[in-house]
Amino acid sequence: MVSVQINDNETIDKMLKRFKKKYERAGVLKEYRANAYFVKPSIDNRLKRSRSRRRAQRANEERNS
């Protein structure tokens, strides 16, 4: 769980900014979206393979440029 203590003489805006940063780094939203609905393992594997192919293709294009 992400928690932030407000420091002395710190504005609410700065505290919220620190909270948002910790929230993103902890991967709370990413985990929520991943677990929002059930995905069959076969479909999950297929998506992982296609993401991997795209990533490899982009890396290959960058090397050739």
Curated annotation (Swiss-Prot):
Keywords: Ribonucleoprotein, Ribosomal protein
InterPro entries registered for this protein in UniProt: Ribosomal_bS21 (IPR001911), Ribosomal_bS21_sf (IPR038380)
Natural source organism: Chlorobium chlorochromatii (strain CaD3)
Gene Ontology cellular component terms for the protein in this record: ribonucleoprotein complex; ribosome
GO biological process: translation
Name by which UniProt lists this protein: Small ribosomal subunit protein bS21
Presence of keyword Coiled coil: no
Family matches, as Gene3D superfamilies: Ribosomal protein S8 (1.20.5.1150)
Superkingdom, taxonomy of origin: Bacteria
Record Pfam families: Ribosomal_S21 (PF01165)
GO molecular-function terms, A-Z: structural constituent of ribosome
Family that this chain belongs to: Belongs to the bacterial ribosomal protein bS21 family.
Matching HAMAP family: Ribosomal_bS21 (MF_00358)
